[in-house]
Amino acid sequence: MSDEQYDAALSLLRRLDPKNVSVNLNSLCKIAPELAEDLLSSVDQPLGVKTCKSTKKEYLTCDYNRDGDSFRSPWSGDYEPATDGPTPSAALRKLEVLANDSFDIYRDLYYEGGVSSVYLWDQGEGDNTNSFAGVVLLKKTSPSSSWDSIHVFEVETSRGEGIYRVTSTVILDLGSKSPKLGLSGNLTRQTEREMAVDEPSQHIANLGSIVEDVESKLRNQLQEVYFGKARDIVGQVRSLGGVEDAKQKQRQEEVIKGLQ
């Protein structure tokens, strides 16, 4: 694989309809199999939903809980179908269970529905919770729209301080009854914070605070970028004011230029 091919593939995906990112990504992987692994790990796509066979609870699927054709359930901790895929250490699995219960409450409060999942994996050797990584996934769908949040993070702990590096992506797809009208896109932001850690469970509270803050900012930015641009386009097609208002505004601008 050459860097030129990889960059060209990413450039192509950026120019295609984000609504069809999964289909376009699969097509590129078939055309250039040597790019598949890198593309699948670097391109965010809408999250899948499966039901845990053991608990009957829904969970989200992505590249972070996949091993071949199997996906690990955060509720049971097992792969479905069964496989010898990577799993977190005992201490980290205990933290993962707490994280899923906590973000399930967060999801219910902020999304009033949808599905959430949290997956953790060890960074260093041994059974510890001082250095680990993970991902927080949230998804809400309606008949014509969907919201997918993906928060990938790394945690390092030293002297009672936790360093959190988070890469957050929101994939938004808004539709309407008209098949010709839709709005799709994604936004990615990186965050790094240092927060106090008294015990391992404090990591979950800290991550919850970070995710809450980042999602609020991303929502506002999406509203400003996408809806603001759509409003500008509509304004260019049909102004809200009359012709006389436009002339008055033009005269005011000319007076201001003269004063300058």
UniProtKB/Swiss-Prot annotation:
GO terms for cellular component: actin body; actin cortical patch; cellular bud neck contractile ring; cellular bud tip; F-actin capping protein complex; incipient cellular bud site; mating projection tip; medial cortex. It is found in: Cytoplasm, Cytoskeleton, Actin patch; Cytoplasm, Cytoskeleton. GO terms for molecular function: actin filament binding. One of its GO terms (biological process) is cell morphogenesis. The keyword Cell division does not apply. Signal peptide: none annotated. Keywords: Actin capping, Actin-binding, Cytoplasm, Cytoskeleton. InterPro entries: CapZ_alpha/beta, CapZ_alpha/beta_2, CAPZB, CAPZB_N, F-actin_capping_bsu_CS. It comes from the Eukaryota. It holds the Pfam family F_actin_cap_B. F-actin-capping proteins bind in a Ca(2+)-independent manner to the fast growing ends of actin filaments (barbed end) thereby blocking the exchange of subunits at these ends. Unlike other capping proteins (such as gelsolin and severin), these proteins do not sever actin filaments. Component of the F-actin capping complex, composed of a heterodimer of an alpha and a beta subunit. Belongs to the F-actin-capping protein beta subunit family. This is F-actin-capping protein subunit beta.
